[in-house]
Amino acid sequence: MHRSILLGATFLAFAVPATTVAGTFPDSHDPVPANWRGPVFRLSQQFPTVDPSKATPAPTYPWQQIDFHTKPAEYIKAVFDYVQEGNREVDWAVQSNAVRPWYHAPWMHSGDKGREFVRGLTRERFTPTPRPGETGELGPQQTVCAQNWAVGFLNAPGGYVLGQVWANPDAPDPLKALFPEGTVAAKLLFTAASLDQVPYLNDTLEWDANINTLTAGDTRCTTGTARSIQKVRLLQMDLAIRDKRATETGWVFATYSYDGSRGGAGWWERMVPVGVMWGNDPDLNQAAFDAGKRVTQSWINPDLRTPQHLGYLGRLNGPVDNPISSCLSCHMTAEVPARTNILPPTQRPPPAPVIDPMPWFRNMPAGNSLDQRSIGTDYNLQISNGIQNFQMWKQAKDGFVAPQPRPAAGPGPHAMPAPSAAAPAADDGQVLVVDGQRVYRVER
């Protein structure tokens, strides 16, 4: 595996003097009102200082005994249960989990999408208003746009990497973003859509959250900076697992969606897997799809009863995700600086044709970047976004604004080159391979 990065002027221009104190990353975008009596989000930031994956004996996980190629539903249920354990009991204040610790990525509080103070939710893609004659992405009852918000967290192996990336709070190091085996990332996604728009969300998990206040008649959910306490409902849960058996990418992604028509004593028993994905099916283009080919590096649950639009040509995606992308495709754009568009180029959302999307659906090994000039953050957008949020804040604070790199234009990201022969040893059990301005990280 190789990992391409740039150690040139573009990235180094972001260097700033140290001012902040380790372990004191902000919790939320907005201050807590003095009269607030509800929950208050606290960032879980006591990151492990020792890599749990290197413990003796080596840690084991319940899903490691299950082959996701042949038993995807069993595999992801084992991960789902692992994430639920101890978190439901503390209402997802993951720092208080008595079973195992979980951690939040720093610097997701910044900007107009930043973490709100009640639950730590950040603003996700809004679900657009359906066009005349089309069914809404959230179902046939959807007639208006809906804003969606989410909170993500990682288990101890992932938390260790967060701590390494942010060990110096004034100089976060994206080179440290390479997750060990057993890392699990999870995200709860909520929608502000009302029950008359999404009736299948009856009896789901409901939270109050300080989210954007929309103006009357706003059909596109364009938002300003004003926020207010509103009801949000759990619609989707995303999971990502670092698993070396996923030889295509190093990662297994999965999505659950809520179905109020299912039985069960609690909302978690009505969460249904949409599918499991370990590769991007790079040969599945429009011509192949039209000829009858379908995804082979994903499993899509045949027993879905709630509205699902899936991703490009049937690849895995969740109900609030963009239908022109996929779980893996979206996350493989995680890089610093962000030069690659998070979505493939398109004239407009489907059914209009997507223009040359296939560079976004290659199988990229863990730790690489789509653009050779950037540093990949191993499929983790919260690390890449957090670092760039921090850099923008520091530039504004210090009165310095560097030119921001534009996303890659034209046909798509650059191809990933092979590493050169030079190989000075690194101190992290890997090899750094120097090739001009680029440096590749290669597994021994």
Describe the predicted segments one by one.
Residues 5, 20-21:
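N-terminus-biased targeting/localization segments
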Residues 1-8:
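Bacterial N-terminal signal peptides that target proteins for export
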Residues 22-329, 334-338, 344-444:
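Conserved small-residue
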Residues 8-17:
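Bacterial N-terminal signal peptides
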